[in-house]
Amino acid sequence: MYDVIVIGAGWCGLVAAKTYLQVCPDARLLLVDGDSSIGGTWSKERLYPHLVAEAHHGLFEFSDLPMRRDTVLPDGRIPSAAVHDYLTEYATKFDLIDRIRLNTWIENVRREPAVIGDNEAPRWMLTVAGSCEQIPTKKIIIATGLTSEPYMPFLPGRQEFEGEVLHSKALGHPQTGDRISDPSVRHAVVYGGSKSAFDAVYLLLRAGKTVDWVIREQGGGPSMMTPLSILGQPSFRLNNSRLLALFSPHPFDTTVKASWWQRVMHRRSGRLAQLAVIGFWRILAYLLQRPWKYNQSANGRRLRPLLALDSLFWSPATLGVMTHPELWDDIHSGERVTIHRQAITALGKDKRVILDNGVELSADLVVCATGWHARHTLFKPEEQLAVGLPSAVSFDPKSQSEWINLQRKADQEIIEEMPILQKSPVPSVPFRCEDDYHLYRFIAPSREPPSHERSIAYVGFLRTAGAPIVYEAQSLWATAYLTGALDVPGPSERISEVARTNAWIRRRYICGRKVPFALFDFLPYVDMLYRDLGVNPHRKANMVAEICGLYQPRDFQGVVSEWLASRGVKDIENV
């Protein structure tokens, strides 16, 4: 039986495994992944031509292995193949390759109680899809993240449709590449308005296709795409400065008193402070949106973010970096791409795609860039709530009433403490408390049954712009939690904290009403995790650099060793 199994061999899983082994070098650890190569989102089978990472060189790496400069483009952009190669190099350096089992899709995870008369404690049992194999383990780390199970919309008539329908996740499959390069495929429809839709449209146009780009009028609208650079610096770097977080109200300050700035600008702030905050975000949004000249064409106007200059602050749709800005020339010319702000209601014979305004399009290929499932199928629906995951199954009446009351109380506290969030656009659908993630610190179930105690943790279940920095912090926190080296509050305090952070996310980020989100607040979140661990999160030499400087993964180099040293343990990697 394994001591711990990590499910997922992408960014989250690799650093979770490396960190656990650094703390517990003798542990029997296994990584499993359903793909045929490591990398998760950046596995070989998910890469396709022109795909480029949003983060620039120096930001998309872990603290203990720099990405080689000769693998990236001259302007610092990182090709997808370089990301995959980097993760392979990381797994090799830290001796993870022999512990990884690929082509192993876990169909179900269940908790088995201890057998009477057996000396073994309760264990987790993982069932491998397509076989009768079951793998036992004492502990599990779920590192599949929030982009592993594609969401495909229901499209009536799909069986009669004579073209091909696929999710953007499949764009890297060899057969998809063959299909796109086939000269008989001339017309394509892309459905969705996220960053992946922009990438799909670019790929198809460069392959010589004509594209009808369909984005629903309802929902969060198209992503607000930022330019590659702003004020002479890569725009992605903005997120890696504490300066941006200063203007974002958040609940992650765990010190006795919130900072002076937080109190003045966000905590029970007055009208002038709120105007200053909104003004800051509108000016920044203007600078980021100005290069695209939305009013230059009908296509451009249809890609205008839903809330215009307020789209950056409230984030009705996920943000993205325009890794291929030349796409805007195609968008504005309209010669080979037409944008429709409609929904697809059906597919028909003769390769027809029918929109809700009655317009019929012709398509040899339909690419659904429609995001990811918020549901997680590793656990049965009736077991999901017990492990902190959202579920279609309801809580028992007592627990449901408790969570509803906690939600209401937490929401009231959030708007009292951060009045600006009272102006958050009203959600379009009512919320079930069962739709929330109930994860303390977004890592540990808020209320574990006694048989589950400290045996399950999650890494990568918070969407941020600082992935490597966040994943490293989460991995150390999860390892400390699973090994009993971290003190955590009791269930009552944990569930109150979970209700509070969930209430904040719903108010702060519109797109966070589907999955946990902390776009501009990830550094304060990381601070909180390291404070829990007794590690200093402030890595800069002085206050000016701390506030205005760029935070990179390398700033946290050696953090695991620091934590081990604080516990009087020698790190074998540094001996």
Swiss-Prot record:
Which top EC class is given? oxidoreductase
Q: Which cofactor does it need?
A: FAD
Q: Where does FAD bind?
A: I106
Give the record's pathway: Antifungal biosynthesis
Q: What is its EC number?
A: 1.-.-.-
Query: What UniProt keywords apply to this chain's record, in alphabetical order?
Result: FAD, Flavoprotein, Glycoprotein, Monooxygenase, Oxidoreductase, Signal
Going by the UniProt annotation, this protein carries glycans at: N239, N295
* Gene3D superfamilies reported for this sequence: FAD/NAD(P)-binding domain (3.50.50.60)
* A Pfam family hit: Pyr_redox_3
GO molecular function term, any single one: monooxygenase activity
Q: Which residues form the signal peptide?
A: 1-17
Role of this protein: FAD-dependent monooxygenase; part of the gene cluster that mediates the biosynthesis of the tetrahydropyranyl antifungal agent restricticin that acts as an inhibitor of CYP51 and blocks the ergosterol biosynthesis. The highly reducing polyketide synthase rstn3, the short chain dehydrogenase rstn4, the cyclase rstn5, the FAD-dependent monooxygenase rstn6 and the enoylreductase rstn7 are required to generate the first stable intermediate desmethylrestrictinol.
Q: Which protein family is named in the record?
A: Belongs to the FAD-binding monooxygenase family.
Name of the protein described by the UniProt record: FAD-dependent monooxygenase rstn6
Q: Supply the source organism for this entry.
A: Aspergillus nomiae NRRL (strain ATCC 15546 / NRRL 13137 / CBS 260.88 / M93)
